[in-house]
A protein has these predicted regions:
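Class I SAM-dependent methyltransferase SAM/SAH-binding core
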Residues: 57-99
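Short alpha-helix
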Residues: 200-216
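A short SAM/SAH-binding and catalytic strip from SAM-dependent methyltransferases
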Residues: 108-119
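A short acidic, Gly/Pro-enriched loop at the edge of an enzyme's catalytic core
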Residues: 100-109
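A short glycine-rich, Lys/Arg-flanked "PGG" loop and its adjoining helix->strand segment in the class I
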Residues: 122-134
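Conserved class I S-adenosyl-L-methionine
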Residues: 1-44, 48-54, 137-176
Length: 244
């Protein structure tokens, strides 16, 4: 079982979903949140071919579908996540972002909270860029380095070493840490588990990420609003650009 299989199988279990009701509901509220995060409008993906790279259980795949996408290819490294995503998207499949070959056919490519779980993030960004057609949009979210101190060394340059401690904990102990974070910092159990559980959780400045976009030939680069999954302001770099 990978880090992410544990996350999607156990933390998406009935007990924890009940405690965090609504986080992964496929509803109009989810679509409205996605619109705010990306700057897309109603029918903003009408007739478009889209890719959700690292789709998890499919919350953003659903939003992309509702914004009019003609087709959404969704993939994830976790078989447990794909089981969930397939309920809404028959095109969901198991794959690894590191295995992507250049394939610039997509009008919209999303990589939400995925790149920073790879040791060679810049190389993975290039792989994501290679999927976007001319005039298409790439939207990514990675962790913001400025707020690493809120994550008890589980995020940023210390994450790999800190993960060795995490692996020694029981699942119940891990959940307890997340519950305490919810009490002191806000957010939800899944959001904190998602931050603490992966072996690699690197972080970057908005300036670094913007430079990646420029180097890969994107313009109209925009830093968007933060996510609402945890309460720490701007704890994520949420950015998109248009392939020129």
């Amino acid at each position: 079982m990978t880090d992410f299989d544990e996350q999607w199988k156990k933390v998406m279990g009935e007990e924890y979903v009940r405690k965090n009701k609504g986080i992964f509901d496929f509803t109009q509220k989810r679509v409205e949140e996605f619109k705010k995060l990306t700057g897309l409008e109603d029918n903003g993906l009408d007739g478009k071919i889209c890719l959700d790279a690292g789709c998890g259980p499919g919350r953003w795949t659903y939003a992309i579908q509702q914004l009019g996408a003609k087709k959404v290819d969704s993939f994830d490294i976790s078989s447990e996540a794909i089981k969930l995503c397939k309920k809404i998207n028959p095109n969901a499949h198991l794959d690894n972002i590191l295995a992507l070959k250049p394939n610039p056919v997509y009008d919209f490519v999303l990589s939400w909270g995925v790149l920073h779980h790879n040791k060679n993030v810049r190389d993975v960004f290039t792989k994501m860029s290679s999927q976007v057609k001319e005039g298409g949009m790439l939207h990514i979210m990675v962790y913001n380095k400025k707020y690493d101190h809120e994550y008890d060394s589980y995020r940023g340059d210390t994450s790999i070493e800190k993960h060795k401690e995490w692996e020694k904990l029981s699942f119940e102990e891990k959940i307890k840490i997340c519950e305490n974070k919810v009490k002191t910092n806000g957010g939800d159990i899944h959001g904190w588990f998602d931050a603490f559980n992966p072996e690699v959780s690197l972080s970057f400045t908005p300036e670094e990420v913007k430079e990646w976009f420029k180097e890969e030939g994107f313009d109209k680069i925009k830093l968007m609003v933060k996510s609402h999954f945890n309460s720490i302001p701007t704890s994520q770099v949420n950015m998109n650009g248009i392939k020129s």
